[in-house]
Swiss-Prot record:
It is found in: Plastid, Chloroplast thylakoid membrane. Binds 1 [4Fe-4S] cluster. It comes from the Eukaryota. It is a peripheral membrane protein. It is an enzyme of class 7 (translocase). Its EC number is 7.1.1.-. Signal peptide: none annotated. Pfam families: Oxidored_q6. This is NAD(P)H-quinone oxidoreductase subunit K, chloroplastic.
Length: 227
């Protein structure tokens, strides 16, 4: 194999130094070593599991899955979240050290999905429980979309300031963690009784006046045969 030469990297200077800030150095180290806590409850998590294989290889982004929230700085929620699971999810998020991030993966996590229409126990969006940094829609999203969400989170980490993030999280804490939902009583959609005004009803022949019927009938010319 041919060797690749990098002239800029091979060039050495006796008095070389790197100029940066502590905040940029902290952001660079955190975006290259995200340790996710996998919170999968539905089929969307299977798409994330495919990232472990050699085809996508999520290890190149520095992702190291952890089973303990105290060792993770990223929680990835995938699947439906119910009212009974909400306190445990909030507890896991609170046990994660700062700074911490959240990726909401799939329609069921973001809006409740198809279960949000007639289910009394489904949380209508995980952002009502914990603050979400990246929304990843799809049912389910592809592995390429998961990689794109991780890339966007890395860009967000590289531009943020740690003190401002902590301040915003403390301000949003009062209204973020809630399980109260406003339900509206509506008729069931599975009764089979539909609004007759919305259905198309063709006019019957008895409603057409006889003179109108014979008028259009006489206007049609009979076919002519030519020998």
């Amino acid at each position: 194999m041919n060797s690749i030469e990098f002239s800029l990297l091979d060039r050495t200077t006796p008095n070389s130094f790197i100029s940066t800030t502590s905040n940029d150095l902290s952001n660079w180290s955190r975006l290259s070593s995200l340790w996710p806590l996998l919170y999968g409850t539905s089929c969307c998590f299977i798409e994330f599991a495919s990232l472990i294989g050699s085809r996508f290889d999520f290890d190149r982004y520095g992702l190291v899955p952890r089973s303990s929230p105290r060792q993770a700085d990223l929680i990835l929620t995938a699947g439906t979240v119910t009212m009974k699971m909400a306190p445990s999810l909030v507890r896991l998020y609170e046990q994660m050290p700062e700074p911490k991030y959240v990726i909401a993966m799939g329609a069921c996590t973001i809006t409740g999905g198809m279960f949000s229409t007639d289910s009394y126990s489904t949380v209508r969006g995980v952002d009502k429980l914990i603050p979400v940094d990246v929304y990843l829609p799809g049912c389910p999203p592809k592995p390429e979309a998961v990689i794109d969400a991780i890339t966007k989170l890395r860009k967000k980490i590289s531009r943020e300031i740690y003190e401002d993030r902590i301040r915003l999280q403390r301000e949003n804490r009062s209204f973020t963690f809630t399980t109260n939902h406003k339900f509206r009583v509506v008729c069931s959609t599975n009764t089979g009784n539909y609004d007759q005004g919305l259905l198309y009803q063709p006019p019957s022949t008895s409603e057409i006046p006889p003179e109108t019927f014979f008028k259009y009938k006489s206007s049609v010319s009979s076919p002519e045969f030519i020998n």
